[in-house]
A protein has these predicted regions:
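Short coil-to-beta strand junction motifs in C2/discoidin
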Residues: 78-88, 139-140, 223-229, 342, ...
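A domain-level signal for the mature, folded cores of soluble proteins
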Residues: 96, 111-116, 137-229, 241-342, ...
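Beta-strand-rich ligand-recognition modules
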Residues: 41-43, 48-52, 70-146, 376-415, ...
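Glycan-recognition and processing domains
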Residues: 32-62, 75-82, 135-140, 304-340, ...
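Secretory targeting and sorting signals
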Residues: 1-33
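Residue-level detector of short, conserved catalytic/binding motifs and their immediate flanks
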Residues: 65, 88, 122, 198-200, ...
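Extended, charged low-complexity segments
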Residues: 368, 374-474
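Structural beta-strand segments of beta-rich domains
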Residues: 53-55, 61-67, 198, 343-347
Length: 474
């Protein structure tokens, strides 16, 4: 969950970071490698068929290490079949710790865990890996920096290793290099029942899910086409040690099961084993891809999980490109249909709501958002496309999208409304109260979020008698 600004600071500061400076030099992994293959100062180039590159560093204490850089791969684009990504295998002192999937020729800020290292000298080795698309020939890593952040040490220590999906539906051990790739991870903490103990929960954003919620419902109910799941939760004591028997993970069918698998240090090994990115704690033999994402970031209180994507804007582009490549986008886009159109035609909105007590029997109410345009205020564009099950019945900060005619801008909007409706048969009469719009934006021509232009705070209660209310006007 690093912002672009923070990535820039990390890259510039290089070795003097987090109170644990590291000495860094880029060099060939083999003495015979040509010097120029290291690129310009502060740049490492990893070539298909070329030698591995190495990055020596010195750790001034024991602890968890993280590597950051901006990554690009000429000729690569997640939107094109045969050019989806380049893959770099990353090892520390000869031990494979993580892989990097590079889905773009444009530089993307990335941060990956390297696992626990001891005090002293170490070497990061980077190799161009199998699973790279045919169009990929080189990966460029600019301003690589290894750091050992003390403030985030506990979260990094217990972060899970996500082993890539290898089996059904594709039977391809490298499938996460072309579909449902892990993009970003973060953690959240809360007090445990035992004084001084904490519970740490880890979540991951994937580029999509090949199963589970269908794409139109994802946009309506979750405000995105990525998949976001919690994957691992554990209790730690006051010294940061794992409390035996407390580790659980999100298993197939969204079950919460005890983790009984293998650890690398304190890092549990979990494998993505379903089409909708649920986990198994037993891995397939010799899986080629593994992801130790930097999970040091967390989510602000009172914000939806999608704020993680907002802080990594490139994730919106990758999500949109996967939809285009997998032919999940209708053409031309039409807000009158339920099918997902060009994601640049959607208003991406986060709002907060609560549901009151039921007064009768029947289904719980959900809330959708509606948008009216200045050009025709009589027409209402709904986030749920008038599908009852696509309104949002969960409480707290939530995200949705509203599909609008191509070319619509925020300046064209006459108003945004909250719309209460039961999600099934009958209506239990519970009121729904909306208290904020936290952000609203369109994607630009490059599928990157524009600055938020829609915010509102207040309190509007929706009832059976008064099921709609205007939240925002320009």
């Amino acid at each position: 969950m690093r912002s672009r600004a923070r990535h820039a600071v990390l890259a510039v500061t290089g070795a003097v970071l987090a109170g644990a400076p590291l000495a860094l030099t880029a060099s060939p992994a083999h003495a015979a490698s040509p010097t120029r293959s290291a690129g310009s100062p502060g740049t490492i180039n990893v070539h298909r068929g070329g030698p591995a590159r190495s990055l020596p560093f010195t750790a001034r204490r024991d602890g968890e290490a993280v590597i950051s850089f901006t990554a690009s791969a000429p000729g690569v684009s997640w939107v094109r079949g045969g050019a989806e990504s380049a893959v770099v295998s990353i090892a520390v002192d000869g031990r494979h710790v993580t892989d990097l999937v590079v889905p773009s020729s444009d530089p993307i800020p990335r941060s990956l865990g390297l696992g626990r290292v001891g005090k002293g000298r170490h070497k990061v080795t980077l190799r161009f890996a199998e699973g790279s698309a045919p169009a990929a020939s080189r990966v460029t890593l600019r301003r690589p920096a290894v750091r050992m952040p003390e403030a985030d040490a506990l979260a990094l220590r217990h972060a899970p290793v996500v082993v890539g999906r290898t089996g059904w539906p594709f039977g391809d051990p490298y499938q996460n290099a072309t579909t449902d790739t892990p993009l970003v991870a973060w953690h959240e903490t809360r007090p445990a029942a035992t004084p001084g103990h904490k519970i740490i929960e880890y979540s991951v954003v994937w580029s999509n899910e090949d199963g589970g919620t269908d794409t139109p419902a994802l946009m309506a109910r979750w405000g995105r086409t990525t998949d976001i799941e919690w994957i691992y939760r554990v209790e730690v004591d006051a010294s940061g040690r794992r409390v035996d028997g407390t580790a659980v993970y999100q298993a197939p069918m969204h079950l919460t099961l005890k983790f009984t698998g293998r650890y690398e240090g304190d890092h549990p090994l979990l494998q993505t084993c379903t089409q909708n990115n649920n986990m198994c704690d037993v891995s397939s033999p010799d899986p080629p891809l593994r992801f130790l994402l930097d999970a040091a970031g967390t989510r602000p209180d009172g914000r939806a999980r999608e704020v993680v994507m907002d802080r990594e804007p490139w994730t919106y582009r990758i999500a949109a490109q996967e939809m285009v490549r997998e032919k999940k986008i209708e053409n031309p886009s039409d807000p009158a249909t339920r099918e997902v159109g060009d994601q640049r035609t959607y208003l991406f909105v986060e709002f907060a709501k609560t549901t009151g007590a039921a007064t009768g029997s029947g289904s719980v109410p959900g809330v959708a958002l509606g948008v009216r345009l200045k050009s025709d205020p009589s027409r209402l564009y709904r986030s749920d496309h008038d599908e009852p099950t696509w309104s949002i019945d969960r409480d707290g900060a939530v995200a949705t999208t509203v599909e609008l005619p191509e070319g619509t801008r925020v300046s064209d909007i006459a108003g945004i409304e909250a719309l209460r409706r039961p999600t099934g048969t009958g209506d239990n009469g519970a009121p729904a109260t909306v208290t904020s719009i936290n952000r609203g934006f369109f994607l630009d021509d490059s599928f990157l979020p524009q600055p938020s232009s829609v915010e509102w705070k207040g309190s509007v209660t929706l009832t059976q008698a008064n099921p709609s209310a205007v939240l925002w006007r320009p």
